[in-house]
Swiss-Prot record:
The gene is CXE17. This is Probable carboxylesterase 17. GO terms for molecular function: carboxylesterase activity. It comes from Arabidopsis thaliana (Mouse-ear cress). Disulfide bonds: none annotated. Residues 1-24 are annotated as: Disordered.
């Protein structure tokens, strides 16, 4: 898994000077350096910082992958372990995964996600559907949540359709054993999609949501936590406080504060009906204290929550950091995910 370095120096429109920041689309009004640039006329630029890869997987990886287009805006990448593909009678848990990127960047085809999910499908023995959802600011929230719910609905409809849909791979999925997962903003999406699904009860007879897996979930709030205030963490983390604030400005409905329930679920949905939840946190992540508080509040509402803090690593280390420390933590994460998906 390649190491990817991000420079998260945020620049707002009021601290730029000179003509270098002007463009045929007008001045830049929001920028997270190296990741996204938003112009006055609404034009958005996203530099190609991470390679986009096809679903091709080397045979030694012991899995297959392919893409399925659902609409003009949404598609999925499906990962199936060879162990399941080789046996017609084998069915595996289904894990629906949402990539991170502050709701504003990222892709299910990014090489770092492709590598991680290929490995996860094999080591956790599950079929993975990785969702490529609409991005902000062109599509502000709740667009990503809507896309997530629509993917779950599509899976259910394909499973029960007399036409079969994609039987060759759906026959490998056990819809009575489904998990929603994601990292960073993708973990936020997994959480909000789970809240919607559980509240609606729409799929109760066709889909059993067994658990939620939140890796470094991207939540926020107007009040700062201690880990958000400790700026030295920014040197070890892929997410800085200024970048976090910029992502929320671009993703939330216009005029909303960081106490909006989509950003700060403690304001509304911490008591929502949810299945067992596993939350991964990182020592040098600015989100650590907020995630710990989220676990505490969910437990106080009677939820079953397992929280894990990995030491010596920062935000999204599992896809961005190839150090020996990170590799050790990734191995631990994979083992815990396997045991969560396949409880003894």
């Amino acid at each position: 898994m390649a190491t990817i370095s991000f420079s998260h120096n945020h620049q707002s429109s009021d601290n730029r000077r000179g003509g270098s920041h002007h463009h045929r689309h007008g001045p830049v009004v929001e920028e997270i350096e190296g990741l996204i640039k938003v112009f006055n006329d609404g034009c958005v630029e996203r530099p190609p910082i991470v390679p986009i890869v096809s679903p091709t997987i080397h045979p030694s990886s012991k899995a297959t992958a392919f893409d399925i287009k659902l609409s003009n805006d949404t598609w999925t990448r499906v990962y199936i372990p060879d162990a399941a593909a080789a046996s017609p009678s084998v069915t595996l848990p289904l894990l629906v995964y949402f990539h991170g990127g502050g709701f504003c960047v990222g892709s299910a085809a990014w090489s770092c996600y492709h590598d991680f999910l290929t490995s996860l499908a094999v080591k956790a023995r599950c079929v993975i559907v990785s969702v490529n959802y609409r991005l902000a600011p062109e599509h502000r929230l709740p667009a990503a949540y809507d896309d997530g719910v629509n993917v779950v609905s599509w899976l259910v409809k394909q499973q029960i359709s007399t036409g079969g849909g994609y039987p060759s791979w759906l026959s490998k999925c056990n819809l009575s054993n489904v998990f929603l997962a994601g990292d960073s903003a993708g973990a936020n999406i997994a959480y909000q999609v789970a809240v919607r699904i559980m509240a609606s009860g729409k799929y109760a007879n066709t889909l059993h949501l067994k658990g939620i897996i939140l890796i470094h979930p991207f939540f926020g709030g107007e009040s700062r936590t201690s880990s958000e205030k400790q700026q030295h963490h920014t040197k070890s983390s892929a997410l800085t406080l200024s970048a976090s604030d910029a992502y929320w400005r671009l993703a939330l409905p216009r005029g909303a504060s960081r106490d909006h329930p989509w950003c700060n679920p403690l304001m509304s949905s911490a008591g929502a009906k949810l299945p067992t939840t596993m939350v991964f946190m990182a020592e040098f992540d600015i989100l650590k204290e907020r995630n710990l508080e989220m676990c505490k509040v969910m437990r106080s509402h009677g939820k079953r929550v397992e929280g894990i803090v990995h030491g010596g690593v920062g935000h999204a280390f599992h896809i961005l950091d190839n150090s020996s420390v990170s590799r050790d933590r990734i191995h631990d994460m994979m083992c815990r995910l396997h045991n969560f998906i396949h409880p003894s």
